[in-house]
Amino acid sequence: MSEKWGVIHIYASYNNTIIHVTDITGAETIAKISGGMIVKNQKDESSPYAAMQGAFKIADMIREKGIDKVHIKVRATGGSKSKNPGPGAQAAIRALARAGIKIGRIEDATPIPHDGTTPKKGNR
C-alpha cells in the first residue's frame, strides 16, 4: 500500500487559528477549517478548544481522502507583528497526534523581516 503524504499549514494568531491541508507540493487544497467555523463567539476563535475541535475535523477529512502521514508547518503573524504562534498552535498539533495521524516534520514558517517596516513604538 502506498502511503500518501500531506502538508498541514497551521496559522495561529492571537485572533484566529486556521488549519489548511494541502498535498505535498502545496499546490492543491485538500481541506481547510478556521476557528470561526467551530465556535460562535468571536473571542473564542483563537482558543485551544477551537483549534482542537478543528484538528479532529481535519483529521477525519484527510483520512477520507486517503492521507495518513503529514508534515506540519506552523506560522505566526510575523513581520513587524508577533513572532510567537497563538494559543491554538500547540493544541492543534496535539489533537492531530491524538487523532492517529502520523506526523513527519514540524517546522516554523513564520515570516521574519529582513529590515522591513519600523515596528510600533511602545507606550510611555
UniProtKB/Swiss-Prot annotation:
GO terms for cellular component: ribonucleoprotein complex; ribosome. The keyword RNA-binding applies. GO terms for molecular function: rRNA binding; structural constituent of ribosome. One of its GO terms (biological process) is translation. The keyword rRNA-binding applies. SUPFAM superfamilies: Translational machinery components. Keywords: Ribonucleoprotein, Ribosomal protein, RNA-binding, rRNA-binding. It holds the Pfam family Ribosomal_S11. Transmembrane segments: none annotated. Disulfide bonds: none annotated. Part of the 30S ribosomal subunit. Belongs to the universal ribosomal protein uS11 family. Located on the platform of the 30S subunit. HAMAP family: Ribosomal_uS11 (MF_01310). This is Small ribosomal subunit protein uS11. It comes from Methanococcus aeolicus (strain ATCC BAA-1280 / DSM 17508 / OCM 812 / Nankai-3). The lineage of its organism: Archaea, Methanobacteriati, Methanobacteriota, Methanomada group, Methanococci.
